[in-house]
Amino acid sequence: MISKQEYQAQAAQGYNRIPLVQELLADLDTPLSLYLKLANRPYTYLLESVVGGERFGRYSFIGLPCSHYLKAGGKHVDVYQNGEIVEQYDGNPLPFIEAFHNRFKTPEIPSLPRFTGGLVGYFGYETVYNFEHFAHRLKNTAKANPLGTPDILLMLSQELAVIDNLSGKIHLIVYADPSQPDSYERARERLEDIRTQLRQSCAIPLSLGSKQTQAVSEFGEEPFKACVDKIKDYIFAGDCMQVVPSQRMSMEFTDNPLALYRALRTLNPSPYLFYYDFGDFHIVGSSPEILVRRERDDVIVRPIAGTRLRGKTPAEDLANEQDLLSDAKEIAEHVMLIDLGRNDVGRISKTGEVKVTDKMVIEKYSHVMHIVSNVEGCLKEGVTNMDILAATFPAGTLSGAPKVRAMEIIEEIEPEKRGIYGGAVGVWGFNNDMDLAIAIRTAVIKNNTLFIQSGAGVVADSDPTSEWQETQNKARAVVRAAQMVQEGLDK
């Protein structure tokens, strides 16, 4: 931990949020038990990662209760402090959010991962209406919003625990505001309070089973198939090459949302595992796909397109993999999305600095396997994170190509707002690095109802029944996780 003299020196350099860090051994705890001890209340989060579908990433992140957060809907933003609105803004929320983020000047913490605090939450799909290059084409009709969630919700994470799964250590981080009296001493006291919480045992919320329910499509199979046929008409007319329609399912779910996270991380470990408690609703997800990642001046997108179910035996698994890589439709769709990714990254990267570093490799998850590619670029001077978001949002894998025309068609055929689905969840650090996953394989739990939405990429030779089945396959992991909870994880 830095001394008071070092703290004062950093304040003199113009930093208005200074981290105090304490390192402890926590090898007898898991990220879940630490979340239960330190967080487990509204406006907290747990973020984990599984690399290559097989091993947990080195770091896990637990956000302690956030006193400040932003909610945006349409052209309005509310800033909350301890549950009360303390600031409001009318207009495009994106410049305001960037300016809000930039209010905080912090020194970097050596020897820790790139994320050590900042904005954490989501940008829902309807964020698209705030980008000028989309706004003049999209109608933004007043669609039903049955989930009732904000378009954007971001928490200001100033107290967090970073777990090093390799060393078994935990880094407790508390940011102090040097403009406040006795801020250094109060931050040290807060760290001691957190240490006290760590020493206490936590009540384990056992999952003993509940009423078993089924997921029901709110769109319906036949209406969805009719939309696939309509999209194919647009494709044959030359309007577009691909569109990704989606359908939402819902099921009664009265269990603890954290139990769903437990089941999902076991059943479908993915590069982005996340649990957000937003008070009146929860987001629980296991996304395989980056929307965009910024690390200093590098930017990365990682399109995923092409899906097969996992085999029941190694031989069947290999056969499904070979079948996927030899499927001309799947390959054509994937190549189109690589090109779209190159175009998106190219808009914000230096000339000649865009490259495909992985091309059409297979990544395997619990229920499905995907074709995956990696597109990287070196950012132009002066590119902001909102410029990056504007260039890459929404993902081509959730909209289609050409992107704007595909989004117009989605706007026409889908009866309700997408909400969080198809948007982005993740972190935007104080250091300006950003890591956002696409909000897929993601459940929203609100008012004892679980919502899960999934889509399918429709091209010229798509079969409506197959595309409907693809939406079922993509939702299967979350639905099965919910059913595991209802059967009882701890019986």
UniProtKB/Swiss-Prot annotation:
Which UniProt keyword terms apply here?
Answer: Amino-acid biosynthesis, Aromatic amino acid biosynthesis, Lyase, Magnesium, Metal-binding, Tryptophan biosynthesis
Per the record, the pathway is: Amino-acid biosynthesis; L-tryptophan biosynthesis; L-tryptophan from chorismate: step 1/5
Binding site residues for Mg(2+)? 333, 470
What's its top-level EC category?
lyase
Task: Detail the disulphide connectivity of this chain as listed in its UniProt entry.
Answer: none
EC number(s): the record gives: 4.1.3.27
Query: Care to name a GO molecular-function term for this sequence?
Result: metal ion binding
One annotated GO biological process = L-tryptophan biosynthetic process
Reaction catalysed?
A: chorismate + L-glutamine = anthranilate + pyruvate + L-glutamate + H(+)
| Co-factor requirement | Mg(2+)
For this protein, the record's SUPFAM superfamilies field holds: ADC synthase
Cofactor details (free text): Binds 1 Mg(2+) ion per subunit.
Annotated chorismate binding sites: 306-307, 421, 441, 455-457
> Could you say which residues bind L-tryptophan here?
49, 271-273
How is the protein's activity regulated, according to its record? Feedback inhibited by tryptophan.
Note the InterPro entries from the entry: ADC_synthase, Anth_synth_I-like, Anth_synth_I_N, Anth_synth_I_PabB, Chorismate_C
Similarity comment text for this entry: Belongs to the anthranilate synthase component I family.
Q: What functional role does this protein have?
A: Part of a heterotetrameric complex that catalyzes the two-step biosynthesis of anthranilate, an intermediate in the biosynthesis of L-tryptophan. In the first step, the glutamine-binding beta subunit (TrpG) of anthranilate synthase (AS) provides the glutamine amidotransferase activity which generates ammonia as a substrate that, along with chorismate, is used in the second step, catalyzed by the large alpha subunit of AS (TrpE) to produce anthranilate. In the absence of TrpG, TrpE can synthesize anthranilate directly from chorismate and high concentrations of ammonia.
* Subunit: Heterotetramer consisting of two non-identical subunits: a beta subunit (TrpG) and a large alpha subunit (TrpE).
Under the heading NCBIfam families, the entry gives: trpE_most
Protein name per the record: Anthranilate synthase component 1
- The record's gene field reads trpE
